[in-house]
Amino acid sequence: MRTTKKYMLGFIGCGHTGMAIARGAVAKEYLERYQLVVYDHHDTNMKTAKGERFGLAKDEADVAENAHIVLLAVNPTQADAVLEKLKEHQPECLLSIVTGLSIAHIQSILGKDTQVIRAMPNTPLQIGEGSTALCKSENCKADEYDFIFQMFAGMGVARTIPEDQMNAIVAVHGSVPAYVYYFIECILKDAVSRGIDEEAARALLVQTVIGSGNLLKQNAGKPIEEFINEVASKGGTTIEAINTFKELNLASIIHEADEKCVKRAEELSH
């Protein structure tokens, strides 16, 4: 994708997720360091960006004027104020990873001619194992969207979904790393309470999650129930645990947690 701008991708906000994207794009050799420019109002984040040898912008307007695609990675409560600052500088394409910030709302401030891409990555992106859901405005050009899609796909898995599913998808991958960590933590605490060495239990647990995930990935067409049945055989130990989950209606608990997660995403939407 060609551009007349000095930088290919400019970051407004470069905290945990923004920096993970920047580092991932460079690590995967999708972009060179000199093609990235960063602005963050936190000095510590700017120092980190400087240490990474990324370009440094003096403010939001500087990013918009010099980057072909502007990546918005700020807190939802700060988004409108930043968009107002960008209005005069008309970014060619805005990539937003801000939860709940709709394409229509972005274009209502920046103008309907602005190309907009929304992305929802998750934290394993930091190690190139993330998953990202994306959607785009009707006027977004194929070159711009393909460029961003492939960037995220290079850091894990990427899928295009309708914008009206962006809030619901948070309960599928956006928040799910925390679910997984919580489940592991519960099992780990229980193991330690039974006298099992914490380091050994954690190592075994983590590898079990990695291995189980890879099995699912390598057998994408196989029903998940079959994987469960292969472990939870009749009369064995695992089936006792699975039956307990069912008796306590774990599925209902997960559904309720997802409902509240999605509801909060909808509350943040505008």
Model-predicted segments: where are they?
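A short glycine-threonine-serine/GTX helix/turn-capping micro-motif
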Residues: 169-178, 228
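NAD(P)+-binding Rossmann beta1-loop-alpha1 motif at the extreme N-terminus of oxidoreductases
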Residues: 1-58, 62-65, 130, 192-193
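Rossmann-like NAD(P)(H) cofactor-binding subdomain of soluble oxidoreductases
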Residues: 21, 37, 52, 60-134, ...
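NAD(P)-dependent Rossmann-like dehydrogenase/reductase catalytic/cofactor-binding core
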Residues: 2, 206-270
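Small-residue helix-packing motif on alpha-helices
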Residues: 36, 63, 79, 197-205, ...
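Conserved short alpha-helix immediately C-terminal to the canonical SAM/SAH-binding motif I
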Residues: 44-45, 78, 187
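Internal alpha-helical scaffold of NAD(P)-dependent oxidoreductase catalytic cores
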Residues: 105-115, 131-169, 181-219
